[in-house]
Every structure is written in C-alpha cells, then in structure tokens.
C-alpha cells in the first residue's frame, strides 16, 4: 500500500499510528467526514480585547475612542470588530452628544512604561508619530550622529547623550508645544524608536536634564555642526544675521526689556541672535545670552565662531544685517578683517531731506528680481560717504520706488558688486526674518517655561538642529524645498505607521498620504544605511494598505 501511494514504509506506518490515536481520542466524531466551520476564525486579539471594549463602552466611549485605547495597549483590532463585539453584547449606538460631553470622558488608566533602551526584538507595533523617523537617515548620512556622541552634553546610567539629544529632537520634530503634557508622547513606541528607546522619557526627565546643560556645551555642539555644514557645502559666502525676542510670560525681574515686532511693544524677554544661510536655509549659529551691553559686539562673536581659530577660513565673504545690529566702529573692524558687509543705515531727518533734494537725473532706474518670477522697477542712487568711527569712505546705495515709499539706505564696503545685486542681496535678508518667525511659532520658542538663560539657550539649540533636519529633508523633496517647517510637518512628517522590527531591518509602513509616494522614493537611497544606535539595523520605508 505504501509503495502504491508513493510513501516510504516508515512514513506509512506513522500515518496509521496517528490515525489510531485520533480514533481513541475522538471516538464520538466521524473520523472521515468532519464538519467545516463557517466564517472567519476568531483572532486572538479580538478575544483579549472583548473585556476592554465592554469596560470602555460602559464609560460611554465611542468606537473611535475605544480603537485608540486598544492601539495603545498593543491590541490591533479594527473598528468593525469593535462594533461587532458591541453588537453581540447588546450595546446600542451612543446618542448624539455635544463636543463638551465627549471631552468629559473618564480617561483610561494606562500605566506608562519606564523609559529605557529598546530591546530590538522581533515585534510589531503601531505609532501615531512614526513620520519623524524619516529624519533619521539625514542624522546618520550627514554625520550628525557622531557630533552628538562627541558633544559634551550629559548622560545618565540608562540613557546616553545620543539618546538624550534624540529625545529632545523627537519632541521638537513632533510639534509638541509643552513638555509638561507627557501623556502626548510617553506611550508612543514610534517616538521612542526614534531615540532608540522603548518610549520617550517623562516630562520630569526633560526638566532635570536641561538643568545640567551649560552654554559651553551648546557652543561646542553648534561648532561641530558648523563643520558639517561647511564640509557639505551647505554654507555659502553670505550669512544673514538678526536678533529675535524670546518672550517670557512669568516673573522675570532679572530679564531686560526687548522690542517685539509681533506684539508691537517692549517685553520682558531674552534676546537671541541667529545666523541664517539664504541659499540652503540652514541656521548655523545661535546664542540666547545677548545683553544690551554687548549686542553690538555680537557680529564679531559670530565671526570668531565661524572661523573657530582658523583665520584662513575665507568661505564667508558677506555679512548682512539691519541698522540696529551693530555700530560703525564694528563695521570698520569687519572691513579690516576682509569681510564684506551689507546693512541698512538709519534714516535721519536730515539724510532723508538731502535725498529728496537730489536731482532726478542722478537716480538710476534698475530692475530687481522679485518673487513669482516677477521683476520690480526701482530707482537707486549710488554714492560714497563718510561715517563716524569708520576709516575711509563707504558705499551708500539709496533706493526708492518711484516716490511711493520712503528711501531705503544700504551701506556696504563692497565697491565692485553691481547696484542690482546689492539690492537683491539685502532683500534676501528678509528670509532670515521669515525663518525666525516660523521657527518661533513651530518650535514654540514663544512658550518657554523658564527664565533661565541657559535652559532657553539649550531649547534654542535643539530647535535649530531640528530646523536644519527639516531643511535637509525639504531639499530632497522635489519642488518643496521652499516650504516652511510647519508645512513640511503637515504635508510630510505628520503620519502614523505600522512598525515591524526584524532581524536585519526595521520596516516602517507609513499610512496613505498624498505625498507618501515621494517620501518612499526619496528614502530609497538610504535603504542600505545602517544605524549603530539601532543595533546596526537598516530602516525600510513602505506604504501601508490603509490611511
């Protein structure tokens, strides 16, 4: 018989032996014709979730709210399954409720795990903020990870300096406005994976960590990043400098009053300086410890930072800033250092009156490129003038728009650059004002919870690092490089995903989104990149089958 049906003798006797055992074990059943069960087999997750679903429904949770809670408990059950369970248990549909009634729900008591290094075992989980993981390739590719490891920032017994910095960046990149509301992130596994942790630390840890940071640590870290930007060609020959006011809304008698353009008045605040590259959008330098007594010398401090002891570092050729940034004596110092400057001269009453009396034939009509591939017609007066405290003559370019606006007066020590390029170069300085405004809004620098300058300086440093990661990401997204950080977050970064940790790779299955195909395409060049802080695993980005 075994030979007839192609079995070996030993294999056939094993089949007979197993059949006899089943006859003894299931004597009441037909051994040949067994009924086939109808419908889908019940999943293990649905069985485990039944009690949770019933418990939450008794607290008037909707199907959507129950789904969110089950996901946080690691029970991947669909909304349809939840509805089926409720129907089987005899629950009717919830009555129509006002928004206020929905927000009065008793929150489920979920014990958040203690933050620690991720185990990186084979597992699957969901995350509501997994989109930030698309920034990790840029951290590794550009060598930013090494700068974090070599920085002087503190670490703890369980969380290294790399994991600590990545934890702050994870919150910044996720548009978290207040660190005190840790229930927004302390159970999200995807945000924890970004920092190679099981989950991000609680709010108390972030507060405690920032108390241990010094200004020297921030300066050292920015210096390391500065070298990366220079080596990668992300810093051109021009730097736009500007002050920004970081308001503090508590009691801060030790703080100075600084003018806030957005509020239209002076506020008790901290004054910070930023240096912005107009071409790449990279913010290269920041310092939140600027006082009224030394604000004029900030331009020289930035010059020292840029050269970092290397006087032959001649990449930087132009500094662009407004009229209140420094004084004429420091302009003279820049000129001696061989640095070209572009700035606005303050329009005194006598100066404006003299320009109004200049003959019309001395004004030159110029065409300046504007946004939207358009051009603007202006009139310019190019002349040489003397300034108090400045040795020699300086170039002065006065521009007006056919009498419709007051004259703007640009002064520079560059005598070779055409007038059109002088005006265009200064006009691009407004990009730094736009970048600062966006950064304050998106990274919530206008909501600082401490009046300690060092803590704000650290917060500003982390904001800059995250901003630069957004710029690197945006540069890769075709036709989206000009988007603000807020729009990049909304259109690309803000996304949930199913995450699978495997032996050699971590699979990120991002939910359907309009720009998802572009993200997956631009992540392909990084598919073979290994991440040392994630066990040298690779990260592969895919699209999920649902939105």
Region spans (language model):
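Conserved short alpha-helical interface segments
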Residues: 63-101
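Mobile genetic element proteins and their domesticated derivatives, centered on retroelements
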Residues: 12, 52-53, 66, 82, ...
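Short, basic alpha-helical nucleic acid-contact segments in DNA-binding proteins
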Residues: 19-26, 86-99, 108, 204-224
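Anion-binding and metal-coordination hotspots
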Residues: 109-130, 144-547
């Amino acid at each position: 018989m075994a030979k007839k049906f192609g079995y070996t003798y030993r294999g056939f006797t094993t089949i007979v032996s197993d059949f006899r055992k089943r006859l003894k074990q299931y004597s009441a059943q037909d051994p040949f014709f067994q009924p086939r069960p109808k419908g889908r087999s019940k999943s293990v997750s649905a069985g485990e979730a039944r009690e949770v679903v019933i418990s939450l429904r008794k607290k008037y949770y909707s199907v959507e709210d129950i789904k969110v809670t089950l996901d946080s408990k690691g029970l991947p059950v669909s909304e349809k399954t939840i509805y089926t369970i409720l129907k089987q248990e005899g629950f009717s549909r919830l009555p129509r409720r006002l928004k206020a009634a929905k927000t009065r729900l008793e929150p489920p008591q979920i014990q958040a795990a203690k933050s620690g290094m991720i185990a990186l075992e084979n597992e699957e989980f969901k995350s509501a903020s997994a989109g930030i993981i698309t920034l990790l390739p840029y951290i590794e590719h550009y060598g930013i990870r090494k700068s974090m490891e070599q920085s002087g920032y503190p670490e703890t017994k369980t969380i290294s300096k790399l994991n600590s910095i990545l934890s702050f960046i994870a919150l910044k990149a996720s548009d978290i406005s207040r660190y005190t509301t840790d229930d927004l992130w302390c159970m999200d596994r995807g945000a924890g994976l970004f920092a190679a942790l099981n989950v991000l630390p609680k709010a108390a840890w972030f507060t405690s960590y920032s108390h241990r940071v010094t200004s020297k640590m921030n300066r050292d870290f920015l210096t390391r990043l500065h070298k990366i930007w220079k080596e990668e060609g992300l810093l051109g020959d021009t730097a736009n400098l500007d002050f920004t006011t970081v308001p503090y809304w508590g009691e801060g008698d030790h703080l100075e009053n600084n003018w806030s353009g957005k509020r239209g008045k002076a506020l008790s605040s901290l004054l910070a300086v930023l240096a912005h590259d107009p071409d790449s959008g990279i913010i290269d330098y920041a310092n939140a410890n600027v006082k009224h007594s030394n604000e004029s010398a900030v331009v020289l401090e930035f010059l020292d930072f840029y050269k970092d002891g290397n006087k032959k570092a001649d990449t930087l050729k132009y500094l662009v800033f407004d009229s209140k940034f420094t004084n004429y004596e420091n302009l003279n110092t820049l000129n001696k250092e061989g640095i070209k400057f572009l700035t606005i001269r303050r329009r005194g009453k006598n100066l404006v009156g003299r320009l109004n009396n200049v003959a019309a034939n001395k004004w030159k009509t110029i065409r300046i490129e504007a946004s939207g591939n358009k051009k603007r017609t202006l009139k310019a007066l190019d002349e040489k003038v003397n300034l108090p405290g400045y040795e020699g003559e300086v170039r002065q370019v006065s521009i007006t728009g056919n009498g419709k606006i007051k004259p703007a007066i640009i002064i520079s020590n560059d005598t070779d650059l055409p007038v059109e390029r002088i005006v265009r170069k200064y006009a691009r300085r407004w990009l730094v004002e736009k970048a600062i405004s966006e950064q304050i809004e998106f990274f919530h620098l206008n909501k600082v919870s401490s009046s300690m300058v060092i803590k704000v300086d650290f917060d500003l440093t982390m904001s800059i690092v995250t901003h630069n990661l957004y710029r690197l990401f945006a540069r890769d997204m075709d036709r989206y490089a000009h988007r603000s950080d807020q729009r990049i977050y909304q259109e690309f970064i803000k996304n949930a995903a199913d995450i699978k940790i495997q032996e050699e790779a971590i699979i990120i299955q991002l939910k359907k989104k309009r720009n998802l195909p572009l993200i997956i395409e631009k992540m392909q060049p990084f598919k073979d990149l290994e991440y040392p802080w994630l066990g040298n695993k690779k990260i592969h980005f895919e699209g999920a089958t649902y939105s």
